[in-house]
Amino acid sequence: MKVAAIHIALGRRLPMRAVEDVVAEAGTGLLGDRYHGSRHRHVTIQSQELLDRAAAELGRGFDCGATRRNLTVDRGEIPTQPGARLVIGDVELEVVRVAAPCRLLDDGIGPGAAAALRRRAGSVCRVLSSGAIRVGDTVEVFSPAGC
């Protein structure tokens, strides 16, 4: 699995901006993103494969940035169990919780988007180690200890 897209926004409800790379800071999140400095919601991550399934269910395609997630990987399932780890280059992320789709997605993508994205909206992670994340980077997934 590889990073297919990176999106950040300067503030809540402001447009998401696609970038080729971003700096992740341990304990604080992605530089330049609205959640930088938040306690646990440092990074959100989703799978394009699951977005494609949601688009098929909706009957129309949409850009991965429309979901307002930070990272989109090209394929596979995103771990949702708290404690699961993802490693992208030097950056280590820990899953905190499932990223629930917001009802506002129905406004941005279209009616039924939030329902189509249920169980496909990815995960919320905290940043454990700092480094750069680039489009094309490999993503390694590790299950939580004891699983």
Model regions and ranges:
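Metal-cofactor-dependent catalytic cores
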Residues: 1-147
